[in-house]
Amino acid sequence: MTTRLLPAQVQEPVTFRDVAVSFSQDEWLHLDPAQRTLYREVMLENYSNLVSLGILFSKPKVIAQLEQAEDFPMVESGMFQGVYLGWKSLFEPIVSKEENKKVLKNQRVDKFFNFILGKTCVNEEQLEEQPGNKKNPFSEMLLSVRRGCRQERGFPGVGLVRNPGIKLPFRRKPGVAAGGGKPHLQQYSVLFKQLGFNRARQLCKCNICGKVFFHSSSLSKHQRTHTGEKLYKCQGCRKAFSQRSSLAQHLRVHTGEKPYLCSDCGKAFSFTTSLIGHQRMHTGERPYECKECGKTFKGSSSLHNHQRIHTGEKPYKCNECGRAFSQCSSLIQHHRIHTGEKPYECSQCGKAFTSISRLSRHHRVHTGEKPFHCNVCGKVFSYHSALTIHQRTHTGEKPYACKECGKAFSQSSALTQHQRIHTGEKPYKCAECGKAFSWLSRLNIHHRIHTGEKPYHCKECGKAFSSHSAVNTHRKIHTGEKPYKCSDCEKAFNQSSALIQHQRIHTGEKPFNCKVCGKAFRQSSSLMTHMRIHTGERPYRCEACGKAFSQSSSLANHQKTHY
C-alpha cells in the first residue's frame, strides 16, 4: 500500500509532493526487474481494496493492462511520482463519488483512503480511538504495520504505514523536513534499504543549486546542466546532449522508432511525453492554466509559449535580420525567407511552401474547399483571414490608420502600400527600362507597354486597353457620364484626375517645378514638355523632311506646310 514518513508529533496533512521518491532516469535503469514491479503492485493493490469493498465501477483500461504486463507504461520517465499520479487519477474520481463515500464510511475505511490520496494524516492514536476499528482489516493492517516498523532500527521518531505485502514506494523528499524544521537528510524509508541505499552513506550535494543525489555519477551528470557541457553527440545531425539517455531518445528522430502506442486510436509516438500529451486529446484534460488570462493547455510547453504573449518575451532572434520571435518554430519558418527553402510541396501542382500550414491552405485551391462562412451575406472563403477582411465591408471597420495623414484602411497591406506615398519608396522596378513603382499592380500594368498586351476591351467599340481602370474611363465617352464635377464652376469631367488638374485653375496651384529654372506648372506633362528646352530633346520628327520638334503640337503645325 502507500507509505508516509512523518515525525510522530506532527499531525498536519502532508501532500504527496512532500513524500515522493524520485529517481533520475539513469538511476531507474539500475533497478532490477523485481524492484520495477513496484509500480504495478501499488496500482493493483489499491484497485483490489476498492473491489473488496463492493464498490461498483467498470475496470479501468490501465488495470487490465497492468494485470497482463509487468512493466508500468511510465517506467521510462524514471519518476516514482508516476505511480502515485497514475493511481490517484484513476481511483480518486471513484472514491470521491457520494454513493461510494457512504460505502467507505460504513466500512470505516474513509480515513484510510483519504490518507492514501494525500488528504489527511493518519497515526496510531487516530486509528485506535475509533470503536470497532481493530476489527476492520484495513485499520488492523495499518496498526500492525506501524508497530512492526517501529522495531526497525535506524529510523527513530519516524512513523510508517505500510501493507506487509508491498515494498514501500514513497519516502520523505530529501532535504525537506515536516513542519518547516531543518532538513533531515537521514530520514529514509525501508525502500532505500531494499534498493541498496545505505542510510549512513554520504549524499552528494550540488554546490550550485543544493540538489542532492545518491550517486556521484548522478551529481556529475546533473552539474552539466549548470556548465552546459554536452558529451553525447548524435552522429546523424551532430546535435549534442548532456546525458546518454537523452541521446538515446533523440536517435528515434532519425530511426523513426515509435514504441509508445495510444490504446485509444493506435497512433504511435517516439517519446512517452508525446503520448501523454496526445492522450489528453481523448480525455479533454487541459491541466496547465495561464494565471494571467485563465486559458488552459494540454502541455506545459504550450503554456510556456503562450505566456510570452503576456510578457512580450521574444527569445528567438534571427541572425540575418535581427527580427525576434516568441517561438522557435516561428524563427525556423522565418529563416526560410532568407534561405529560400520551401520544404513543403503540393502533390497536385508541385508548388512549394515554407510552412505546412501554408501548404494546407493552398490545398483548398485544388479541393475548392471554403470552410469559412460570412454570417451576414453567406459568402464563403478558403481562408479565415479572407473572411475577417471581408467582414469589415459590413462593419465598416478600418483598423489600420496612417500615422502621417490619418487615413484608415481595412487591410494592413493596403496601409503598407499607402505609406509609400509619404516615404517615396518604389520597390518594384521594371527590368526593361528601369522605371520604378510603389505598387506591384502598377508595375504589372506598365509591363504591358513593353509587351503590347491590351487584355481589356471596350464592348461598345472594341478598343483595347492595358488596364481595367483605363477601359472604365474610356466607357464614359460612350455613356457621356461625367461624374466628377467642379464645385467652383460646375464643369464636369469623366476622370477624377482631370477634375484635380482643372481645380488648379481656380486655386492657382502649380505643384510641378522645374529644377533648372524654377518655373512652375499645373500638370506634370507640362513640366516634361518644358524640360526639353533645357535638354534639347526633340522626340517628334517630320517624316517628310526630317525636321524635329520638342512638342507634338509644333510637329502638327509644321506638317501643314507640306500640304
From Swiss-Prot:
The keyword Transcription belongs to this UniProt entry's keyword annotation: yes
Predominant subcellular localization, coarse grouping: nucleus
Annotated Gene Ontology cellular component terms: nucleus
InterPro entries cross-referenced by the UniProt entry: KRAB, KRAB_dom_sf, Znf_C2H2_sf, Znf_C2H2_type
CDD domains, alphabetized: KRAB_A-box
A Gene Ontology biological process term: regulation of DNA-templated transcription
Domain KRAB: 14-85
Signal peptide residue numbers: none
Compartments where located: Nucleus
C2H2-type zinc-finger residues: 204-226, 232-254, 260-282, 288-310, 316-338, 344-366, 372-394, 400-422, 428-450, 456-478, 484-506, 512-534, 540-562
GO molecular function: DNA binding; zinc ion binding
Keywords: DNA-binding, Metal-binding, Nucleus, Repeat, Transcription, Transcription regulation, Zinc, Zinc-finger
Ranges in a coiled coil: none
Family assignment from sequence similarity: Belongs to the krueppel C2H2-type zinc-finger protein family.
Functional description taken from the UniProt entry: May be involved in transcriptional regulation.
Protein name: Zinc finger protein 879
Gene: Znf879
